[in-house]
Amino acid sequence: MSRPKILITNDDGIFAPGIRALWEAMSEIGDPIVIAPHTEQSAVGHAITLTDPLRVVSVQRSGGFEGLAVSGTPADCAKIAIKSILDQKPDLVISGINLGSNIGTNIIY
């Protein structure tokens, strides 16, 4: 049986410690692919980028961690991964691990 393909993203950015911890944990059970925002994108909800071009760059860190950093939102990352980057749809999509509380639904504008 083949290992599941796991797409990992977050809202804290590809350099956040939580995404690396999640990548390490998911490496035990599947083949994780990290595609996350290049910079912190907290509190953007389901936003997507409509007017600016999305840029994707390869990121390599110590310990074998590698992924793609996208100049957009977490939703952009998932969408571009599934529609343009991956050869096949992932078996699982995970977002996290968050640096702080997930309070998006508690914010009143």
Which role fits each region the language model picked out?
Residues 12-20:
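Short acidic, Gly/Ser-rich segments with clustered Asp/Glu that frequently serve as metal-coordination loops
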Residues 2-6, 20-85, 89:
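A cross-family phosphate/adenosyl-ligand binding-site feature
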Residues 92:
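Short, Asp-centered acidic motifs that coordinate Mg2+ and/or phosphate
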Residues 12, 40, 73, 98-101:
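Short glycine-rich anion-binding loops that position phosphate/pyrophosphate groups of nucleotides
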Residues 10, 66, 104:
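Conserved short-loop catalytic and cofactor-binding motifs
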Residues 9, 35-37, 95-98:
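Short beta-strand segments
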Residues 101-109:
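Glycine/threonine-rich flexible loop motifs
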